[in-house]
Amino acid sequence: MSRSRQIAPSGTSQVESVPQQPNNTSTVRVPGTLRLRAENEPTVESNTEGRGLHRHIRWSEDVIDNEGMGKRSSKVCCIYHKARPVGESSSESESSDSESSDADSDNEIDNPRNTLGRSSVHHITDNHSHEQESEHDRERGRLTCCPNHGHRKLKRRRPSPNAYEKMPKTTKGR
């Protein structure tokens, strides 16, 4: 059986089935034509350029609502995490030590594990220049200044919970 596929300029496709000559001539096949057409043409809506096509999603009755919320959605069910530079912590707390907990965060100035390489090196030497510290590091609360100089450590804000940790808001009337 041979098949040919043609795409018409109107956006429809056509598939033809042509029978081959079988060895047994008692079977007769009738060639058929299958024509596919869009149910509705896309509506043209004006956007900033005036040329855009706007398509709507129409859910059929057999679509399964897999989240049990009574909503049908075309969104992917996952959380996107922005890419981070190499060497930057992947946790929300920006801590380089995975063993630290919230109880330890009160004593972070005295904790030598929370100092970065450059800022801990100048504890040993007499060179007390803080020019190497970037403004970005100071804003993000990454640097711990020397306790000997009277510098204050910047407070870190508590990490906000991610979408899996948040409890959904409920209305009390239901």
Curated annotation (Swiss-Prot):
Residues 123-142 have a biased composition (Basic and acidic residues). GO terms for cellular component: nucleus. Residues 94-109 have a biased composition (Acidic residues). Residues 149-159 have a biased composition (Basic residues). InterPro entries: PPI_Ypi1. The keyword Cell cycle does not apply. This is Type 1 phosphatases regulator ypi1. It comes from the Eukaryota. Keywords: Nucleus. Residues 1-72, 84-174 are annotated as: Disordered. Pfam families: PPI_Ypi1. Regulator of type 1 phosphatases which maintains protein phosphatase activity under strict control. Signal peptide: none annotated. The gene is ypi1. It is found in: Nucleus. Belongs to the YPI1 family. GO terms for molecular function: protein phosphatase 1 binding; protein serine/threonine phosphatase inhibitor activity. Residues 1-28 have a biased composition (Polar residues). The keyword Flavoprotein does not apply.
